[in-house]
């Protein structure tokens, strides 16, 4: 992948990706089996030793938001939505998880969502389901 090639070109010793504790059952590329297979493929792909790490694998998304807020992460410049477009849709699974994480972390979500996206109050009332 392009990320891997870039890591090799700058002689980085690690590649990190942001799988978190809530991802395992939902996304195949966040499961332990995938991470182990990718780590093996990376080791076989080049003479350089590059380690695949998942620093947030035991963190909830709310934990990540809390820590990001402490570090001053510009959340308005981050992207979660799977639908694409100019704004987050506010309705897809990742948008709902994002909104729930900010709510649980008690951090203001600076994300502009598309018109018609459900409110956090309505999502909370429906146990974070549409």
How should each PLM-predicted stretch be described?
Residues 92-94, 129-130:
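Amphipathic, soluble alpha/beta structural segments
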Residues 15, 19-87:
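Catalytic subdomain that performs nucleotidyl-dependent activation
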Residues 26, 87, 93-116, 120:
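Iron-sulfur (Fe-S) cluster-binding segments and ferredoxin-like electron-carrier domains
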Residues 116-130:
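Conserved catalytic region of serine esterases and O-acyltransferases that act on ester linkages
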Residues 7-12:
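Glycine-rich phosphate-binding loop signature in dinucleotide/nucleotide-binding domains
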Residues 2-4:
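Short, small-residue-biased leader/transition segments that mark boundaries at the very start
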């Amino acid at each position: 992948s392009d990320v891997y090639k870039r890591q090799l070109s700058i002689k980085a010793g690690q590649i990190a990706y942001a799988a978190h504790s809530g991802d395992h059952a939902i996304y195949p590329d966040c499961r332990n089996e995938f991470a182990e297979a990718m780590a093996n493929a990376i080791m076989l792909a080049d003479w350089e030793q590059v380690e695949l790490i998942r620093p947030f694998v035991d963190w909830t998304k709310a934990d990540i938001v809390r820590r990001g807020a402490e570090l001053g992460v510009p959340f308005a410049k981050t992207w979660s939505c799977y639908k694409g477009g100019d704004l987050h849709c506010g309705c897809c699974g990742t948008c709902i998880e994002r909104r729930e994480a900010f709510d649980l972390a008690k951090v203001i979500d600076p994300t502009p969502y598309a018109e018609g996206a459900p409110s956090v109050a309505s999502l909370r009332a429906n146990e974070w389901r549409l």
